[in-house]
Amino acid sequence: MMSGLLSKKDIRSNLSNISGWVFEDNKIKRVIQFDTYMASIDVVNAIAKKAEQVNHHPEIIVSYCKILIELTSHDLGGVTTDCFEMATYINSITNDIKK
């Protein structure tokens, strides 16, 4: 995957289509709460597997029953359509998780 940087206007428009994400520090970010620590680890593992497949790797911080995900293009230094594709994937695998 590789796409060009999005403008702030495009980022705001894309954010309106996915729930839970914010634009901050030139990244899109989301915090997700879980009922158990292992549920959070299961999601991190699923994200890691997808990230390897598409070569777009988020920053992930794991806390007890909570993860912080930050998406940006490390190569381009900002948010791209790849970031939003990954965010959409993350939302799809966390829809059924109690937050």
Model regions and ranges:
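Charge-rich alpha-helical segments
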Residues: 1-99
